[in-house]
Amino acid sequence: FNLLKETLPRYGITTSFVDVANFAEIEAAITDKTKFIIAETLGNPLGNIADLEKLAEIAHQHAIPLVIDNTFGTPYLLNVFSYGVDIAVHSATKFIGGHGTSIGGVIVDSGNFDWEKSGKFPQFVEPDPSYHDISYTRDIGKAAFVTAVRTQLLRDTGACLSPFNAFLLLQGLETLSLRVERHVENAKKIAYYLENHPKVTKVNYASLPSSPYYDLAQKYLPKGASSIFTFNVAGSAKAAREVIDSLEIFSDLANVADAKSLVVHPATTTHGQMTEEDLRACGIEPEQIRVSIGLENADDLIEDLRLALEKI
């Protein structure tokens, strides 16, 4: 959020923030300077789900690509390219690595977007004088975008993993499906438990039938809406903090999608740099708690939450 709102504008790159579910608002925000639409499969921390097919339709009508952050969706739960997405990005630190040991990212190009026909991306069409006058669309074809990322951006920005971090992420990838299956199984059990707890006023988890995103979850994420979600406790920020401090198995850490279960207070940690207005716009409330459900025994995690909720 801060990258798009604060940092990139210093370099002349601006972003129009819109409601991902308001298609008229998205259409109205697109200008002749718009280069792409970007959204998350699952928003953080509310777990709202983007309608990928509709977003792809809008993007392609305007000859721009749809870029989706599928970090929470994971390649196991959702193949975004099946729904018209052009480029997928992931924080590999999360489910792909799986153990919170490395910082890294992934860009995956579907190869389906026609950069030349779009007319908005001369850097991929015209000869690149820094690389033997190669034309990425002419000489590379479907892999034009990802090749340009590797030969230009990787070379010029130095955003390269060390061999050891690459090894850790590749090792994590080997067990991705097995781990995510357990993550989701645990998350569903815990979300159902919390939804029926008298001291919990709200659970934001799209796999719950009560969620406004349930239908989209059934369409795009039938295996489960990941394992990161938020819930609100009865009371104030003080009550939320007391619950967090009383947990024994959950670690009070700001990362997510780790093998171990994690918990944070979003309003004062992950989103603590945001203004009150921005927090409200994102649906982040003082009494809200975010959990990232790990691979432990689900009954142990439920018991940990039960005891912590008794403290308020």
Regions found by a protein language model. Give the residues of each.
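Flexible loop/turn segments at secondary-structure boundaries
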Residues: Y76, G97, S211-Y213, K238, ...
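Short, solvent-exposed polar/charged micro-motifs at secondary-structure junctions
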Residues: I26-A28, P212-A217, L262-A267
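Conserved small-domain helix->loop->beta segment predominantly found in fold-type I
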Residues: T157-C160, N165-A166, Q171, T175, ...
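Short glycine-enriched loop/turn motifs at secondary-structure junctions
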Residues: G100, K223-A225, I284-E287
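Conserved PLP-enzyme active-site core in the AAT-like
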Residues: F1-N196, N204
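PLP-dependent enzyme catalytic core of the Aspartate aminotransferase-like
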Residues: K5, D32, R179, D245-S246, ...
